[in-house]
Amino acid sequence: MAASGGTKKAQSGGRRLREPSSRPSRRARQRPRRGALRKAGRFL
């Protein structure tokens, strides 16, 4: 996990999706860690 803007953005999004684990359950599953890693890789 590289400390970069991409990871920060991914973490904020993950936290938002993790908080309301009632409606965006499928979205949270689709963007658990793969989305964060993909965003970080793209930003790096």
Swiss-Prot record:
Pfam families found in the cross-reference section: PACMP (PF23699)
Alphabetical keyword list: Chromosome, Nucleus
Gene Ontology molecular-function annotations: poly-ADP-D-ribose binding
GO cellular component: nucleolus; site of DNA damage
Compositionally biased spans, kind Basic residues: 24-44
GO terms of biological process kind: negative regulation of protein ubiquitination; positive regulation of DNA repair; regulation of protein ADP-ribosylation
Subcellular location: Nucleus, Nucleolus; Chromosome
Region (Disordered): 1-44
Subunit structure: Interacts with KLHL15; preventing ubiquitination and degradation of RBBP8/CtIP. Interacts with PARP1.
Described function: Micropeptide that acts as a regulator of DNA repair both by preventing KLHL15-mediated ubiquitination and degradation of RBBP8/CtIP, and by promoting the poly-ADP-ribosyltransferase activity of PARP1. Prevents KLHL15-mediated ubiquitination of RBBP8/CtIP by competitively blocking the association between KLHL15 and RBBP8/CtIP. Recruited to DNA damage sites via association with poly-ADP-ribose chains, and enhances the poly-ADP-ribosyltransferase activity of PARP1.
The protein, known as: Poly-ADP-ribosylation-amplifying and CtIP-maintaining micropeptide
Organism taxonomic ancestry: Eukaryota, Metazoa, Chordata, Craniata, Vertebrata
